[in-house]
Amino acid sequence: MSRRLLYLLLLFVLAGLLLFVPMPIAPTYAGRTLENAGHTPLFFLVTLGVLFTMRDHPRFPGVRLYALAGMIGAGAGFISEVIQKPLARDASWEDVAADAVGAVLALAVYALFERRTKMRAWHRLGALAVALSCIAIFLTPIVRMTRAYVHRNGEFPVLADFHSRIELYWTLSFGVNREIVGDALEVEFVADEFPGVAFHEPVADWRNFKTLVIDVANPAAEPLDLGVRVHDRQHNHTFNDRFNRRYPLAAGERRTLRIPLEDIRNGPRQRLMDMAHISDIKLFRGGQAGSRRLRVYSLRLE
């Protein structure tokens, strides 16, 4: 076995370990973004490894080498996602696309620097354009994530105020439609069982504050049974391990809810809430009847 082929096999083994062995990645926006972004450099290296391993093979000169490496790189990415599906792993078409971007980037970078194949200047310019496009695709979600964190941290102790669409990066829907209209988040409850919107991953340390202030309105002609729940990173996903409270809103009523943080701290039954690591705030409809609309103006700490 040639040394190049051995290196390629080791690279495939390493790629398999990175894809299928659970990694200690935090369940945060940053963690998810960086985990997804990692597919592109991984399959860039896999495809580049195929190119360097097979470049001296007489059956794959010129364009054939690029076709082989591209098919192996992109195909390996697709197969890796197919394999993850029955293993209850987080397989997605987004990951397949990221794998393909890595493979195409490897082909473009290789074309820029290899001199065995006779290429015209415009071929190399095309390869440069493709490489830059792939790098832009790779960097876009990372830049978007960075902007979201800078915005979130700069607004604190305001947790959400909906003056910018960046706020939507920190909201999750559970059986609702949501959209920013003016300076408020308009929420339409669609599902019947506890639909709501979560404000995920706020600035976590609330220890220097006394009150959670939520400015909301019920714009509908029916009353709304509004539920508020808050939990920390230790939350075990049970009702008794978080703060829960209901607030009835009359038809057309706008109200500022003021929740003492001491109440939130004492929310879990068997322990105290970790006020240095708050993870999630959720506003939801408590019952199946009543208003199907909620307007959220802001959430802040005082």
Language model segments and positions:
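Bulky hydrophobic segments
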Residues: M1-E94, A100, V104-A204, F209-D215, ...
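Short, solvent-exposed loop/turn segments at secondary-structure boundaries
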Residues: L87-D90, A221, R271-L272
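Extracellular beta-strand ligand-recognition surfaces/modules
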Residues: I214, T256-L299
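Asparagine-centered strand-capping/turn motif at beta-strand->loop junctions
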Residues: V216-A220
